Structure formats: structure tokens, C-alpha cells
């Protein structure tokens, strides 16, 4: 079922989400299916549970090819609960970001270039991966949603922030 994506200004996006406690449950599997369906319908590359007004540390992400980010390499489709992120270097990388909760806008955001992330699949299987580049960016962006943060709070140069159909800033 496609869920409504709440937008910036809704205070539910600013809360720290509690951990998932029902790993392996039918309810969690149904929620994950809804999240993937919602993400795909919105042509997104990731979605966090708080974006559909579900207060849980849960994210989905991944794609073979993205209409919104055509230059981005494929990212494995993943559902991840109770996420932890560790930067593997101090190296930061600037890149364009948008958000399904902030439709039509984009900005250049600095993110760690290489990270290790861990958590649990919906069935309770542990997941631990290293990611770099766009894959790392997507995971960090979705993680921000789990801790009540939206990408505009990370903007360093507001000349890069604007509507997708108007922006002309080059990286």
C-alpha cells in the first residue's frame, strides 16, 4: 500500500525514532513492503519510516537505475532497522540531495565519502556493509531522518539550495 509522505514543517519529522522491537513480525514485513512501494511510486532512492509518520528506526533504500539521479551507480535494495553508522575516514564529499519530504528542492550537501553501516533486516538477520559515494550518501541521508534531522540543516552554501527546475549551480 502506498503511504502518504509527510512534508517538512510536520513536527513528526523532527523526532528521534525509537528502535524497532518486532523484528521478524508479519506487521514489520508489511510495513517494509509498504515503504518500498511508497518509495518506488515517488521515484525515490530511499525512505525512512518517520517520512510516512511511523515512529521507528527503519529505512529502505536502493535502486538499479534512478530517474532522479541518473549518474548514480546502482545501490542494493535494502531494508534496515536500528541503524548504526560509522565514518571510515574524515574525507567529505559534496553532492546533490533532494528529499521526498521536501519536494521540488535540492541542495549541495557534504557527507562522509566512506562509511560502515549496520543494523538488522526485517527478519532479524544482522547486516553490516561498507559503502562509499552515492550509496554512503543515501544511507546517511535516511539515517538523518531517524534522528530528526532534514538535509537543509546541513547546507553550507545556500547558493546551491533551490528548486530543481531553476537551479544552475555546478559542482
From Swiss-Prot:
Keywords from the named record: Hydrolase, Iron, Metal-binding, Protein biosynthesis
Keyword Metal-binding: yes
Enzyme class, spelled out: hydrolase
Binding-site residues, Fe cation: 99, 141, 145
EC number annotated for this UniProt entry: 3.5.1.88
GO terms under biological process: co-translational protein modification; translation
CC cofactor note: Binds 1 Fe(2+) ion.
Reaction(s) this enzyme catalyzes, per UniProt: N-terminal N-formyl-L-methionyl-[peptide] + H2O = N-terminal L-methionyl-[peptide] + formate
One annotated GO molecular function: metal ion binding
Cofactors: Fe(2+)
Keyword check for Iron: yes
Gene3D superfamilies xref list: Peptide deformylase
Xref: InterPro entries: Peptide_deformylase, Peptide_deformylase_sf
Catalytic center residues: 142
Pfam family, one: Pep_deformylase
Function, in words: Removes the formyl group from the N-terminal Met of newly synthesized proteins. Requires at least a dipeptide for an efficient rate of reaction. N-terminal L-methionine is a prerequisite for activity but the enzyme has broad specificity at other positions.
Family from the record: Belongs to the polypeptide deformylase family.
Name of the protein: Peptide deformylase 1
